[in-house]
Amino acid sequence: MAKLLPRIGSRKNGRISSRKNARKIPKGVIHVQASFNNTIVTVTDVRGRVISWSSAGACGFRGTRRGTPFAAQTAAGNAIRTVVDQGMQRAEVMIKGPGLGRDAALRAIRRSGILLSFVRDVTPMPHNGCRPPKKRRV
């Protein structure tokens, strides 16, 4: 009979999650990726290790409602609530993408009480790279 080995990153093994929660993070980076279909908010420390994340889909929005500004606001609030409890006071914000949730997510971040050192738009812009997809005909 084979012996069951505990998986290192499993939910049952509480060692990793408890170590994550024990860290005090005074400064971090908030990444907002706003597409037309969804908004993903990831909070990392300065070295880039993920502390918390949320998305409109993970907050319970489905279908076309995931791309709305209210869904982005909810996702940003959920992602930031955990890091504020861990003691984050200052953050940099990196916003990527053309979606409707850009401004709503930024508004939710401002309201959370975290001091923003800077807000940067890191949307990738091609220097005449790949050919874009053909126009939709509805």
Swiss-Prot record:
Entry-linked InterPro entries: Ribosomal_uS11, Ribosomal_uS11_bac-type, Ribosomal_uS11_CS, Ribosomal_uS11_sf
GO terms for MF: rRNA binding; structural constituent of ribosome
Protein's UniProt keywords contain Ribosomal protein: yes
GO biological process, one term: translation
Gene3D superfamilies linked to this entry: Ribosomal protein S11 (3.30.420.80)
Biased composition (Basic residues): 9-22
UniProt entry tagged with the keyword Ligase: no
Signal peptide (from-to): none
Keywords assigned: Chloroplast, Plastid, Ribonucleoprotein, Ribosomal protein, RNA-binding, rRNA-binding
Localization annotation: Plastid, Chloroplast
Disordered, as annotated region: 1-22
A GO cellular component entry from the record: chloroplast
PANTHER family membership: 40S RIBOSOMAL PROTEIN S14/30S RIBOSOMAL PROTEIN S11
Family: Belongs to the universal ribosomal protein uS11 family.
Subunit and partners: Part of the 30S ribosomal subunit.
Protein name per the record: Small ribosomal subunit protein uS11c
